[in-house]
C-alpha cells in the first residue's frame, strides 16, 4: 500500500530551532553548528494510528531578508509547524505579530501546531541569567498554551531537539492534524497571491 503523502512547512523566527528539529526528526542527529537556512527539504516516514505517512518537510528561513522568498514554500501545505524558542520570549511575541498573519494569509484553513523549541533551556542557569539582564524569563508552558488558543492552533507541543525530548510527538501531532484536515470540494491548501 502506498504511503499517504503530506506536506509540512515549518516557520518561526531565525535561530529558534526549526532546522535542528527537522534534522533530529528526519536524520536522528543534532547539528552542532548554526547555519541560517535559505530553503531546505527533507522527507521522513512516520506511522500514526496505523497509517503510513510520507512527510515532506519544508524548512524555511525566519530572517526578515527572506520575507519575500518564504511564500514560495506555502502552496499545497497540509500542516504548519509554527515555532518559537522557549529561551526567547521575543520569538513568542512574533507568533501573533508576524507568523500567524503571514500563515493565515497564505494558508487559510491549514492546521497550525504551535511548537516551543529548546525546552531544555527553560531551567538552564546561564539562559535564565542572560534573560534576567533584560528583565525577561524563559517562556512558561501556560504562556505557550495560551498563545496556541489565541491563534486558534490545532495544538501546542514543547520539545528539545538537543535531548530529543518530545520531538517525535510534535510530528505525530502534526501528521494527525494533516490527516484530519477537512478538504472541501476545491483543494483548500495554501495560495500564493
From Swiss-Prot:
Modification type 5-glutamyl serotonin: residues: 63
* Topology of the protein relative to the lipid bilayer: Lipid-anchor
**Name this protein carries in UniProt:** Transforming protein RhoA
Keyword Lipoprotein: yes or no? yes
What does its UniProt record remark on the domains? (Microbial infection) The basic-rich region is essential for yopT recognition and cleavage.
Positions of modified residues ((Microbial infection) O-AMP-threonine): 37
Return the EC number: 3.6.5.2
* Gene Ontology process terms (BP): actin cytoskeleton organization; alpha-beta T cell lineage commitment; androgen receptor signaling pathway; angiotensin-mediated vasoconstriction involved in regulation of systemic arterial blood pressure; aortic valve formation; apical junction assembly; apolipoprotein A-I-mediated signaling pathway; beta selection
Outcome of residue 14 to V?
Increased Rho protein signal transduction. Constitutively active
Question: So where does GTP get bound?
Answer: 12-19, 30-37, 59-63, 117-120, 160-162
Report activity regulation: Regulated by guanine nucleotide exchange factors (GEFs) which promote the exchange of bound GDP for free GTP, GTPase activating proteins (GAPs) which increase the GTP hydrolysis activity and GDP dissociation inhibitors which inhibit the dissociation of the nucleotide from the GTPase. Activated by GEFs such as ARHGEF2, ARHGEF3, ARHGEF28 and BCR. Inhibited by GAPs such as ARHGAP30. Inhibited by GDP dissociation inhibitors such as ARHGDIA.
Q: Where would I find the Glycyl lysine isopeptide (Lys-Gly) (interchain with G-Cter in ubiquitin) crosslink on this chain?
A: 135
Motif Effector region extends across 34-42
Which locations, inside or outside the cell, does it occupy? Cell membrane; Cytoplasm, Cytoskeleton; Cleavage furrow; Cytoplasm, Cell cortex
Q: Where is this site: (Microbial infection) Cleavage?
A: 189-190
List-wise, which residues carry (Microbial infection) O-AMP-tyrosine?
34
Q: Which disease is it linked to?
A: Ectodermal dysplasia with facial dysmorphism and acral, ocular, and brain anomalies: A neuroectodermal syndrome characterized by linear hypopigmentation, alopecia, apparently asymptomatic leukoencephalopathy, and facial, ocular, dental and acral anomalies. Patients show no intellectual or neurologic impairment.
Q: Which cofactor does it need?
A: Mg(2+)
Q: Which reactions does this protein catalyse? A: GTP + H2O = GDP + phosphate + H(+)
